[in-house]
Amino acid sequence: MGRMHSSGKGISSSALPYSRNAPSWFKLSSDDVVEQIIKYARKGLTPSQIGVILRDAHGVSQAKVVTGNKILRILKSNGLAPEIPEDLYYLIKKAVSVRKHLEKNRKDKDSKFRLILIESRIHRLARYYRTVAVLPPNWKYESATASALVA
């Protein structure tokens, strides 16, 4: 799938392991991995950060292979899932930082244009999350209250 606001094709990607089973050298049980996920979520880490830590520190290539569930599903079942989806959260955070930059640098036309692109991405993603019922139907992005969402 190509990029939304540029001509890039986006063909670079990582290759998933062919085997859908845990490797033979992997010794942790699925309960241990779930406990680790819950522990890191309570520290305030996002699902992708938890996945990176599990991969680098504990040798878990994919949590779904070991536990049978994705990290976000495990967090939802334990009531630790973030209220705003992670990709939407980081887009809002980026828009807040660009808006803060524009307060100091009012003549920065390029940043003004990029802010419009970021906010259009936010609106499109929010519309998708409302249709799949991840966000409530009356949820709306407003630039005035956005800094409170990411703080």
From Swiss-Prot:
One of its GO terms (cellular component) is hyphal cell wall. It is found in: Cytoplasm. It comes from the Eukaryota. SUPFAM superfamilies: S15/NS1 RNA-binding domain. One of its GO terms (biological process) is translation. One of its GO terms (molecular function) is structural constituent of ribosome. Keywords: Cytoplasm, Ribonucleoprotein, Ribosomal protein. InterPro entries: Ribosomal_uS15 (IPR000589), Ribosomal_uS15_arc_euk (IPR023029), Ribosomal_uS15_N (IPR012606), uS15_NS1_RNA-bd_sf (IPR009068). Pfam families: Ribosomal_S13_N, Ribosomal_S15. CDD domains: Ribosomal_S15p_S13e. HAMAP family: Ribosomal_uS15_A. Belongs to the universal ribosomal protein uS15 family. Component of the ribosome, a large ribonucleoprotein complex responsible for the synthesis of proteins in the cell. The small ribosomal subunit (SSU) binds messenger RNAs (mRNAs) and translates the encoded message by selecting cognate aminoacyl-transfer RNA (tRNA) molecules. The large subunit (LSU) contains the ribosomal catalytic site termed the peptidyl transferase center (PTC), which catalyzes the formation of peptide bonds, thereby polymerizing the amino acids delivered by tRNAs into a polypeptide chain. NCBIfam families: PRK08561.1. Component of the small ribosomal subunit. Mature ribosomes consist of a small (40S) and a large (60S) subunit. The 40S subunit contains about 32 different proteins and 1 molecule of RNA (18S). The 60S subunit contains 45 different proteins and 3 molecules of RNA (25S, 5.8S and 5S). This is Small ribosomal subunit protein uS15. It comes from Candida albicans (strain SC5314 / ATCC MYA-2876). The gene is RPS13.
